[in-house]
Amino acid sequence: SIVWNSSRQAWVVASELARGRGFVLAKNTLMVLTVASAVGNAFAQNVSSGVVSNGVVSSGETQVVYSNGQTSNATVNSGGIQNVNNGGKTTSTTVNSSGAQNVGSSGTAISTIVNSGGIQRVSSGGVTSATNLSGGAQNIYNLGHASNTVIFSGGNQTISSGGISDHTNISSGGQQRVSSGGTASNTTINGSGVQNILSGGSAVSTHISAGGTQNVSSGGNASDTVVNTSGFQRVSAGGTATGTRLSGGNQNVSSGGKAIDAEVYSGGKQT
């Protein structure tokens, strides 16, 4: 701690003052508490043990959650960063516009809310569960794993090299992008939600509800997709769809696209 030394007219380390005078005046003690409080409010707290609740990470600040540390109900504002790794855990973090949450090596983030302009990155063995993308973005790559993400209107999830997503729910206006080396399994597409499978990307066991769309681009692969009434699967030239089940939905296969072992049930249509 630092204190004001009236004789020196300067701030000094408290331990030095104690050695020189043998005590610290009550006035100086009050100053110590005031300075400590100000520092605590000005900077994000790194967390390596215990639980820190309701913290705020502001512009230019980085909060690191690691080891056995946990945070609850943190808020990451514009320009702020929350890094979760090495056994750290966060619950119910809110990431606002231009804020970021990075979930890395053995880190876990549960029930994060990512608002418009915010981003959550999941990589290097990091795990997330029940992230809500309320207009924000989630990028999953390099052995990152995201489960039970919900993508609302304006939100987007990108799964790339080595990234895994399972049980994502895409609501109307939301979008999932599966690019090279990424895998999405058990995705549900609702309303006007969209799943785009790009070259080298793979989607397994997608369920498409009314108004939802799965686009399989050149080099992309979709397997065991279920297309329900008024849902769409579109397979472009060079794309491949295997084992699609049309339960009242539609499959459109462009010239050069492949549809293998499709099953067409009542109300289903393949063109």
Residue ranges and their predicted role:
Residues S1-T34:
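Bacterial Sec-dependent N-terminal signal peptides
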Residues G40-A44:
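Sec/Tat signal peptide C-region and signal peptidase I cleavage site
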Residues Q45-Q70, S78-T271:
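Extracellular beta-strand-rich, repetitive "passenger/adhesive" scaffolds
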